[in-house]
Amino acid sequence: MLNINIEKQFSQLQLKVNTQLPLQGVTAVFGRSGAGKTSLVNLLGGLTTPDKGEISLGDTLLFKHKTVNLPPEKRRIGYVFQEARLFPHYSVKGNLTYGMRHKTPELFDKVVSLLGIEKLLSRYPSTLSGGEKQRVAIGRALLTSPQMLLMDEPLASLDLPRKRELLPYLQTLAQELKLPIVYVSHSLDEILQLADHMLVLHQGKMISQGPLTQVWNSEQMRPWVPLQELSSLLSARIADRHPDYPMTRLLMDDGNQLWVSGQLPPTHKQLKVRIQANHVSVCTEEPKGSSIRNLLRGKIKELYPSDNGEQIQLKIALGKDELWANITPWARDELQLIPGKAIYAQIKGVTMTQMDIAESH
């Protein structure tokens, strides 16, 4: 485990985090601007020193107040910043091999292949696109043979086409490398595609931490997501494809099924499916003759009025999964919606795109 129990007073922020993070998969650190995300990873990497507490990575003590403070180069932690920070006078190959602990051709070839940078090795940073520079920066961090990788919003400085270019490489790294990654982001799109776990910060304090689906669907996330962006993550597996239409059927653990647009490639892995709360409607009886393909049976768990009172955020239990829906107070009153009531949730399959579906690692 990555054990964190630290405090640090910055000029406008007091950071205080006490938690344990798993040493496998990707842990996303999420929060608004100024929440302390970058400050936290700088403390983990040794770029900043806590005022008190301790940090340990597995059996290695990285920091303990007044007794231990390993410098960054001794922590065996790779760091990828928002900007690539490549050496302009070195070729791509020179940047990659800088700081390699062991000159092993096998590791070099594997990292270069995973990141798709074989054809860039003789080029210099000034000739690279933003996405290419970030791939090289990630490769350089991996070739130091780290025990953990810190990534501080590596896509933040890229435009949308470059983000789409780099994201598949990050997905491959997350799946192929047995290396814990702490990934800072304010983008829920990135977190959905990459993360297994999630830690939410607000004003320097941790307000939630745990498996991605659990945190994403939690009440603690609600205040930090705009009403129109509220969404749920459901777990499902590919069952089959429609024989006549470009649709794929997903099967949930509770027996409910989801039809999504497109013919997804076969996989035995569990999928994470994002459902926007604004795309969910509810009814108390099974509808007949509807164009909506997805009808999920569930029970109302909780109802939360929005801050402006114009909408109700409805939480629906679907076996072990939970689904959010935005409805009006009028609908709540007319349908007599209360906790424990059995209902049907309707979701249009065409509203779910490839960016709303990700494999669990």
Curated annotation (Swiss-Prot):
Catalyzes what?
molybdate(out) + ATP + H2O = molybdate(in) + ADP + phosphate + H(+)
Q: Which GO terms describe its cellular component?
A: plasma membrane
Q: EC number(s) of the enzyme?
A: 7.3.2.5
For this protein, the record's InterPro entries field holds:
AAA+_ATPase (IPR003593), ABC_transporter-like_ATP-bd (IPR003439), ABC_transporter-like_CS (IPR017871), Mo/tungstate-bd_C_term_dom (IPR008995), ModC_ABC_ATP-bd (IPR011868), Molybdenum_import_ModC (IPR050334), Mop_domain (IPR004606), P-loop_NTPase (IPR027417)
UniProt: ATP binding residues: G31, R32, S33, G34, A35, G36, K37, T38
Q: What topology does it adopt in the membrane?
A: Peripheral membrane protein
Example GO molecular function: ABC-type molybdate transporter activity
Q: Which residues form the ABC transporter domain?
A: 1-228
- Swiss-Prot/TrEMBL keywords: ATP-binding, Cell inner membrane, Cell membrane, Membrane, Molybdenum, Nucleotide-binding, Translocase, Transport
Q: What residue range is the signal peptide?
A: none
What region holds the Mop domain? Answer: 289-356
Places the protein is found: Cell inner membrane
Alphabetical list of Pfam families matching this protein: ABC_tran, TOBE
Q: Does the keyword Membrane apply?
A: yes
Report the top EC class in one word. Answer: translocase
UniProt keyword ATP-binding, yes or no: yes
Oligomer and partners:
The complex is composed of two ATP-binding proteins (ModC), two transmembrane proteins (ModB) and a solute-binding protein (ModA).
Similarity section = Belongs to the ABC transporter superfamily. Molybdate importer (TC 3.A.1.8) family.
Q: What does the protein in this record do?
A: Part of the ABC transporter complex ModABC involved in molybdenum import. Responsible for energy coupling to the transport system.
Q: Protein name, please?
A: Molybdenum import ATP-binding protein ModC
Naturally occurring in which organism (per UniProt): Shewanella sp. (strain MR-4)
Q: What is the lineage of its organism?
A: Bacteria, Pseudomonadati, Pseudomonadota, Gammaproteobacteria, Alteromonadales
Q: Which gene encodes it?
A: modC
